[in-house]
Amino acid sequence: MPKVDLFNQNGEKVGDLQLADSVFGVEVNTYAMHQVVKALLANKRQGTQSAKTRAEVSGGGIKPWRQKGTGRARQGSIRAPQWIHGGVVFAPKPRDYRMSIPKSMKKVAIKSALTSKVNENLMVVVDEIKLETPKTKEVVKMLNSFNAKKTLIITNNAEENVYKSARNIEGVQIIPVNNINVYDVLKYDKVVITKDAVSKIEEVYA
């Protein structure tokens, strides 16, 4: 069973925390993580790109000049791809990029991502993060105490003051635990997570 240090938001160690093997100590499945990230990125695509082929460009029905005797290269239509305003070869058309991933694979992927962070000592567990008023410098101070630059902060219920304090810090993203996803966990160098959020993850994914 993995064990990690438990810190307060001042960066001081206040104890240890045992993590569930079934969530934070699984065999890392890189294939599952790759498939889920691929699907997440594909599902973000709008798929609205479009261009006209030579068949769809208006005009150009007549041959621009006669075949022989002009000294110029022969041309059949001003709609040909080599012409300015001509059609596009293999023109992109609107399409749906959506991919569906089984729930079981999503579960395996998120557990693998969290386990990889624990294995590499890139997960910091904090007992709680609370602020009386929005203060960005307090969150920056906390992250500096953990030597965390590009960081994902995960809370059980993101308090408004904490959210407002963290949202404008470059390279930092804060999300409630219900919005956790593989892409964000892998994208950021470090994960700073509250103790309550850990319990919630173990409850859902164990």
UniProtKB/Swiss-Prot annotation:
The cross-references to PANTHER family, in alphabetical order and at most eight, read: 50S RIBOSOMAL PROTEIN L4, LARGE RIBOSOMAL SUBUNIT PROTEIN UL4M
* Chain residue ranges for the region called Disordered: 47-75
The terms describing its cellular component in GO are: ribonucleoprotein complex; ribosome
Which HAMAP family has this protein been placed in? Answer: Ribosomal_uL4_B
Family under the similarity heading: Belongs to the universal ribosomal protein uL4 family.
Recorded protein name is Large ribosomal subunit protein uL4
According to the record's subunit comment, the protein's assembly and interactions are: Part of the 50S ribosomal subunit.
KW Thylakoid (keyword) present: no
Q: Which UniProt keywords apply?
A: Ribonucleoprotein, Ribosomal protein, RNA-binding, rRNA-binding
> What molecular function terms (GO) are annotated for this protein?
rRNA binding; structural constituent of ribosome
Question: Which organism is this protein's natural source?
Answer: Clostridium botulinum (strain Hall / ATCC 3502 / NCTC 13319 / Type A)
Q: Name one GO biological process term.
A: translation
Among InterPro entries, the record links this protein to: Ribosomal_uL4, Ribosomal_uL4-like, Ribosomal_uL4_dom_sf
Keyword DNA repair part of the UniProt annotation: no
Origin: domain of life: Bacteria
Q: What does this protein do?
A: One of the primary rRNA binding proteins, this protein initially binds near the 5'-end of the 23S rRNA. It is important during the early stages of 50S assembly. It makes multiple contacts with different domains of the 23S rRNA in the assembled 50S subunit and ribosome.
